[in-house]
């Protein structure tokens, strides 16, 4: 069905409003679809307080064997073809593309459909039609789907871990942390939905009954990244549908397999067809169709700055038949810095920078891309950082002993190596790495790279590299270090290592990032512990994993009745 042929239907939000306004049995009744109070003794009301899922340490031999078996099982399914899922129906596209193991670029893990613009439109229209019924489902019931999905995810945990080891090149612990974060999002957002569903407090006045409650938006397009392909995908998607919206989910073409595993979980818990629709393919071929469709109400995106800004621009253009201002929730990366003060534990600082710079090959928006070191300890810190980096094992991460795996694809590898070349041409001093790893195998492996004597305005001091490269910048003193830290267009994460309370407090006031860490690394945010999102070109400061996050997928409605 073309855009011009779309059924008029009820506009987004109207179905729920109709339900609210035509089912009143009293002045404060009739909003069961979003804010019905759970029945006493129901499963949702008996939920324990939220607690983060613990990551495996894989010291137990039985657990290691189970993980190796899970990896073998995923490898045994390599080459399988997967369909689009639209309205619960499995649909073919216009040909297929493969998702590959970056540790072994000859291994095709799965074949995925290339969705066409027409299929993208069909997915939006299906989600739009489903919204009328899904938006009427009580909040408690919607939250229960998240809790059930979390339980299935726990049961399939090693399978999900193994998929990310093979598809994204995560080491075992990084992969398991990704799965744990996905479980955390499900458990936390389910509880948050129950909280938002309760009556909201208002000031009372004589002669009126007043209420304020939240209703969903409509159809959302969810575009997650490949680097946290389960955690961020699950967080973005579950937040959108637990609030009563329907979703078109378009995973990255570098991580469709783990996204498809999540769809299997949603099918297993019997989430109604059409609530989440799964389309794969090139963002260039279907992205504009999804974002620009007049029935798209919001876009939730995590990815690069340039793609994010393109989404913001397209979403701002009103399409024929569009009756709302589209909402965009965007996280777009960072150029994150760790400041190393003259008065600090340099051994701890070197370990923290190594982990934050090179964990998951530096392919985190929160990664330490810059180490800004006060002059007095600059040379000593460099010596310690190089020594720490020399301990890193590089190789295929299906083997537990390898800590640093491959970068995601050839395009990423070429880009990272180009940045390393530019860094040296602009005056940087190569201290470690700087080239592909010769011993690692048939994958996209780059040695962990340290470039010293970088200037703040150098290319590698400003641009996000998204690879295992740490630019080290010398600062005259602590004040200069904070100035340098703020001297980029980004503002996502940052850290300060210092023994001086006054300097930590200065950083608290002046280091302009959404997530600031003191005397620890700048990576590793936990749900409901470190609400995550950044300033400036890092995005809309959406604070995933926070008690504000679900509001981004809701709109408030006030109703007053004279009595």
Model-derived segments and their meaning:
Residues 19-20, 38-44, 104-110, 129, ...:
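Conserved C-terminal structural/oligomerization subdomain of aldehyde/semialdehyde dehydrogenase
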Residues 19, 265, 270, 292, ...:
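ALDH superfamily catalytic-core signature
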């Amino acid at each position: 069905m073309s855009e011009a042929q779309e059924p008029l239907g009820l506009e987004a939000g109207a179905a729920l409003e109709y339900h609210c306004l035509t089912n009143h049995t009293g002045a404060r009744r009739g909003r069961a679809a979003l804010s019905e109070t759970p029945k006493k003794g129901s499963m949702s009301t008996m939920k324990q307080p939220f607690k983060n899922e613990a990551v495996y340490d894989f010291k137990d031999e039985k657990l290691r064997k189970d993980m190796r078996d899970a990896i073998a099982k995923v490898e045994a399914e390599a080459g399988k073809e997967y369909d689009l899922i639209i309205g619960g129906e499995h649909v073919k596209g216009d040909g297929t593309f493969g998702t590959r193991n970056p540790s072994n670029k000859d291994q095709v893990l799965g074949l995925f459909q290339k969705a066409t613009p027409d299929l993208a439109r069909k997915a939006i229209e299906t989600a739009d039609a489903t919204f009328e019924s899904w938006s009427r489902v009580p909040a408690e019931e919607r939250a229960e789907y998240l809790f059930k999905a979390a339980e299935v995810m726990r049961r399939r945990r090693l399978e999900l871990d193994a998929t990310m080891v093979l598809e994204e090149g995560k080491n075992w612990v990084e992969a398991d942390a990704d799965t744990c974060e996905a479980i955390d999002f499900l458990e936390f957002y389910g509880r948050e939905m129950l909280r938002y569903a309760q009556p909201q407090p208002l000031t009372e006045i004589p002669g009126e009954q007043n209420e304020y409650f939240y209703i969903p938006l409509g159809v959302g397009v969810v575009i997650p990244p490949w680097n946290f392909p389960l955690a961020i995908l699950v967080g973005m998607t579950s937040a959108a549908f637990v609030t009563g919206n329907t979703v078109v989910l378009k995973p990255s073409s570098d991580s469709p397999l783990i996204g498809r595993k999540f769809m299997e979980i949603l099918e297993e818990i019997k989430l109604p067809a059409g609530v989440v629709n799964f389309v794969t393919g090139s963002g260039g071929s279907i992205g504009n169709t999804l974002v620009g469709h007049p029935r798209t109400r919001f876009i939730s995106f995590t990815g690069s700055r340039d793609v994010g800004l393109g989404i913001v621009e397209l979403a701002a253009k009103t399409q024929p038949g569009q009756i709302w201002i589209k909402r965009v929730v965007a996280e777009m990366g960072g150029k994150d810095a760790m400041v190393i003060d003259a008065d600090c534990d340099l051994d701890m600082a070197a370990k923290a920078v190594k982990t934050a710079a090179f964990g998951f090959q530096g392919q985190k928006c929160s990664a330490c891309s810059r180490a800004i070191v006060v002059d007095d300890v600059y040379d000593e810190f460099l010596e310690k950082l190089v020594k720490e980096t020399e301990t890193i094992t590089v190789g295929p991460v299906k083997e537990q002993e390898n800590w640093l795996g491959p970068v995601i694809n050839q395009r990423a590898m070429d880009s990272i190596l180009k940045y390393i070349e530019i860094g040296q041409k602009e005056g940087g001093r190569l201290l470690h790495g700087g080239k592909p790893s010769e011993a690692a195998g048939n994958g996209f492996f780059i040695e962990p790279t340290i470039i010293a004597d970088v200037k703040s305005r150098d290319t590698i001091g400003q641009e996000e590299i998204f690879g295992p490269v740490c630019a080290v910048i010398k600062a005259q003193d602590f004040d200069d270090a904070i100035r340098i830290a703020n001297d980029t267009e980004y503002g996502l994460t940052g850290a300060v290592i210092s023994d001086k309370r006054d300097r930590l407090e200065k950083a608290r006031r002046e280091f302009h990032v959404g997530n600031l860490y003191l005397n620890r690394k700048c990576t590793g945010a936990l749900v409901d512990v470190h609400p995550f999102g950044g300033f400036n070109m890092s995005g809309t400061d959406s604070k995933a994993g926070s008690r504000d996050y679900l509001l981004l997928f809701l709109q408030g409605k006030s109703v007053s009745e004279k009595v």
